[in-house]
Amino acid sequence: MTRTVLLGAMKDKFADIYTVVREAQKRAIGKIRSGVRMSEVDFAARGYIHSRGYGKYFGHSVGHGVGMKVHELPSVSRTSKDFLKKGMITTIEPAIYIPGFGGVRIEDMVLVTNKGCEILT
């Protein structure tokens, strides 16, 4: 689980970035259910971030599997050919990082179900 904390007054740009990342996460989580290709989940978040003008500031995958280790395959990425399966636990962690300004990442773990997912964090 990752949260972003701001110390001090919030600038409009930071508020916009936070809102974009939060919405990107909601869109990705909305795609999760057994049988969906992981790249579709990635695109739901990545496409939204790109549409808001921040695409070049999101340089990693949307998430990854969680099991005995914190970071496990399969990856929720744009190149993944894997499908979500009931019972999988994965992270959904879109982010925007702007050099010289700062960044926002919001990460939650979800349990994949047949009809969607259960947010665990």
Give, region by region, the residue ranges found by the protein language model.
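Active-site neighborhoods and metal-handling regions in enzymes and metal-associated proteins
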Residues: 1-121
